[in-house]
């Protein structure tokens, strides 16, 4: 996938997830995410928003660790879904300028993570969809590329 295709996939995913989150109740936002049982739907969204926030603010110490991810979730605990979506929207133009500068394979890995969490949220809400999206194609490409670069037959 080209950098532009990955950036387009993220923009589409962000819009799709925001639309989905606007359609849910407060109770649904507190539903446990089956594949991330320590998180609620709102916590998962907080992480999805927290990664771009951290990139924008240069908060990359411990990137991709549990501690880094937990900081994203914890700082948004008091926020409502509406607050989270407003923050995501406010940061979108700045992150759109950063996103194409992220080198591969990190760019596609970011997209893989975002796509995974979109579908984590969808599973928790019982609202499947977006399985034919460009985000899925980017994620599949990331997995295939990762496997082809890794010579370990156990992986």
Could you describe each region identified by the protein language model?
Residues 21-25, 52-59, 125:
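A generic secondary-structure signal for well-formed alpha-helical elements
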Residues 2-35, 41-46, 50:
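N-terminal "assembly arms/tails" that initiate or stabilize quaternary assembly
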Residues 41-68:
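Conserved alpha-helical segments that form or flank metal/cofactor-binding pockets of metalloenzymes
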Residues 74-91, 98-103:
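A short, structured beta-strand-centered segment in the mid-to-C-terminal lobe
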């Amino acid at each position: 996938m080209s950098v532009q295709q990955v950036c387009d996939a993220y923009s589409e995913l962000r819009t799709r997830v925001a639309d989905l989150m606007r359609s849910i109740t407060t109770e649904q936002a507190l539903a446990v995410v089956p594949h991330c049982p320590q998180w609620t739907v709102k916590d998962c969204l907080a992480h999805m928003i927290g990664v771009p926030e951290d990139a924008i603010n240069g908060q990359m110490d411990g990137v991709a660790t549990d501690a880094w991810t937990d900081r994203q979730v914890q700082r948004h605990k008091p926020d409502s879904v509406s607050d989270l979506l407003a923050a995501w929207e406010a940061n979108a133009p700045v992150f759109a300028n950063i996103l194409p500068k992220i080198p591969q394979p990190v760019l596609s890995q970011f997209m893989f993570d975002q796509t995974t969490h979109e579908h984590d949220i969808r599973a928790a809400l019982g609202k499947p969809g977006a399985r034919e999206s460009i985000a899925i194609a980017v994620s599949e490409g990331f997995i295939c590329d990762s496997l082809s670069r890794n010579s370990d037959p156990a992986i």
